Amino acid sequence: MVARTLGVALSAEFRHNAHWIELMKKIIRILGWSAVALVGAGAVSTIALRRGEPINALWLVVAATCCYALGYRFYSKFIATKILVLDGLRATPAERLENGRDFLVTNKWVVFGHHFAAIAGPGPLVGPVLAAQFGYLPGTMWVLAGAVFAGCVQDFVILLFSVRRDGKSLTEMAKDEIGRIGGFVAYAAVISILIILLAVAALIVVNALKASSWGLFTIAMTIPIALLMGVYLRRIRPGKVLEVSALGFVMVLAAIWGGQYVSQNAGLASVFTLSAPALAILITVYGFAASALPVWLLLAPRDYLSTFVKLGTIGLLGIGIVVLHPTLQMPALTRFVDGTGPVFAGKIFPFAFITIACGAISGFHSLISSGTTPKLIARETETRMVGYGAMMAESAVAIMAIVAACVMQPGIYFAINSPAGIVGQAPAAAAATISGWGFPVTAGEMQALAHAVGEQTLFNRTGGAPAFAVGMAHIFSHSLGGETLMALWYHFAIMFEALFILTILDAGTRVARFMVQDALGHLYEPLGRTSWYPSILGTSALMVGAWGYFLWQGVKDPLGGINSLWPLFGISNQLLATVALCVATTIIIKTHRAKYAAVTLAPLAWLLAVTFTASWHKMFDPNPRVGFLAQAQALAAAPVTGATSRLIFNNRLDAAVTGVLLIMVTLVLVESVRQWIGILRGAREARVKESPFVRTRFAEERG
């Protein structure tokens, strides 16, 4: 009896202690997250309110870290539990439809790496660098807020909705959930937008590599390296992933190191020093080869190689920023907030938002979130980490790009990014113009910097990529090796950027080719077969020719091409995000969770305001530096030459493309709103086309 009484007492005491332990853990969690919130609020306040004196880049790092941590812990969890209702017991298409080729149950960290490598393109590197002409403040605030409340949300919900529909694409989901008309228009819009995105990605690579023998040699060598890796893994040593990884890594380092000797040899340097038009031709040939060749031969090994380079370099850059903790030289806001900026014309609203694009929200991501990634997810609960988390990682890259651009002296930043048509062709004239804006720089300073990084000149290197490379080389050389290695770090950065972007170029061309083949297959069945080479070659040529035309337009533009094509890129990208959010909102309303629809409706409303305003300005603004039609009219009033007549046609074409995209997205929006109103009024049946529930065989692993 005594023993029983003692046991009951001990049991009660144990429960009492366990209760207090849990309570203490809860209090510690609350205090910990409160501290994160307070530190984050302090960092954001410092960034937003500090005026008249430079701030340390660590404030941006701290603000970003806190915002991402809070967003992932609380906002993504709210979405996962209240809106999407993630179910760890539900089998994913990777499990149900596993075929070892397209559908394959894959480790969540491998899926995360694949997804990040696939979505991380030119946007987070280039957009924030270009937008830095407004100062560091606008870009930083939009990257943080846009990623947490818009970009990560879009990627997460589209990924989960695709997983629940057997990995269907965005356009297929649009057809199923919005209707046939909305689906058809969405398909046409996606193809059109993809062409613009690929053209601009190619233009950035061209601008980064033109007149750079070191950079071009390094990138050119990655093609035979990728081919060798593909053959080695497929034919020579099948399955030896670690061997081929080590081999590829060593060869890439050798290519970077060897590039400096190529640049110092007059004969070899002349071979690898090419003009922008020549590079444009070569990159279109590469795009065709990457789309038409077997995926194991070039695309897969290059993507595999670039994934290691991307993740490793981003990690090193983050460490470099923390170690160096540089001061931002760019002011919070510059004089160019009035829309007269030399990098691109236009006021902060809406142009800062469409310029930053992918660093905050990217429509292109919705194609990946409804493409290969949902076919690899092992469990629904992993979509939160992959969808929301990978976009946070890309947003962190955008913050690093802002730091890289803003640690330079503003005069150097504008000398690199301003086109010759704005500041002048001669170095002395360009330096005088930029100094006249209040950002001192001399031709001698620029020549010394060019010599330090192993380039002939850094004036008028538009496109954002060269400026990012200079900033990145500055951070690395001052924190990881000394200034004597600045040239090596600069060309490593160029190689990193080109690999970063070429991954999007070759994968995007292949995705577009698949979409075109799928459409043509309805007209003639063999054209839809992805294994039939006449169809492969024909559709690859069609897609490469389409984006190659816009690339050619950009390289022949006397204002650097980026002035006209990057706004078109930003508008197209954000319009694609608008389509994705229309689909997401429709599904949320159909699943009887309309009270939570603001999670996607709020970013949708913001994107509509931004993209429609930007589109209107790009078409009809009377300022020739802003409006396509105004520039065409101004050129037509001057003496017409072959070059000006081509520019007139291109500007009118850009205006027409913008208008057509706007109309198509408007139609998708109208069809979506009709669905929403009908469902909320009870006039339409709220039926979603999800795959039936099947219990996963991994149920015992639920946690």
Regions from the PLM with identified roles:
Residues 58-65, 70, 76-79, 83, ...:
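Membrane-interface loop-to-helix entry segments
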Residues 41-54, 125, 137, 195-211, ...:
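Transmembrane helix-loop junctions in multi-pass membrane proteins
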Residues 54-73, 131-161, 171, 214-226, ...:
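Extracellular loop-to-transmembrane helix junctions
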Residues 45-50, 56, 102-165, 176-180, ...:
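Membrane-interface helix-loop-helix modules in multi-pass membrane proteins
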Residues 16-37, 70-124, 307, 346-347, ...:
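Membrane-interface "cap" regions at the ends of multi-pass membrane proteins
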Residues 321-337, 392-470, 507, 552-557:
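Extracellular/periplasmic helix-exit of transmembrane alpha-helices
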Residues 76-104, 130, 144, 153-182, ...:
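Flexible loop linkers connecting adjacent transmembrane helices
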Residues 177-195, 387-396, 462-464, 483-493, ...:
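Loop-to-transmembrane helix boundary motifs in multi-pass membrane proteins
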